[in-house]
Amino acid sequence: MATGKIQTKFGDIEIEFFADAAPKTVENFVKLSKSGFYDGLAFHRIVPGFVIQGGDPNTKSAANRSKWGTGGPGWTVKAEFNKNKHSRGALSMARSQDPNSAGSQFFIVLKDSNFLDGQYTVFGRVTAGMDAVDKIAALKCDSADAPVDADQARMVKVTAS
């Protein structure tokens, strides 16, 4: 079973990946994690009662704040919609309007959001550390849903195997 961990200042978020349901998506996330791509990035979109979103390389610097939410790894992964639900703790790929545009950005669901089912690729779930997720979700944000103090929302290190 493939697993991962997102280290944050609020504690570790432990993840179980759904490699059978979304093999290419899991492979992509593991590859990015092993390369250090996610280390130091911020959860740049925080919508209380909905999701926290991260994985944009533009969030390494506050100077790029206007570009937060637009970055990726330079490639995309085809959608792998599956039977897994967008329930609390689900790990899913963020994307643009094109279903096949996911790259590195992902989100963790804070509250059951079944309206996302079949439209976004669920590729894992949080098995421990939802308390850390909830603390990130409670951070003060600006009008663009970005954390006012991005250092509070940083992913210190992301590992996966």
How would you name each of these model-derived features?
Residues 1-161:
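Cyclophilin-like peptidyl-prolyl cis-trans isomerases
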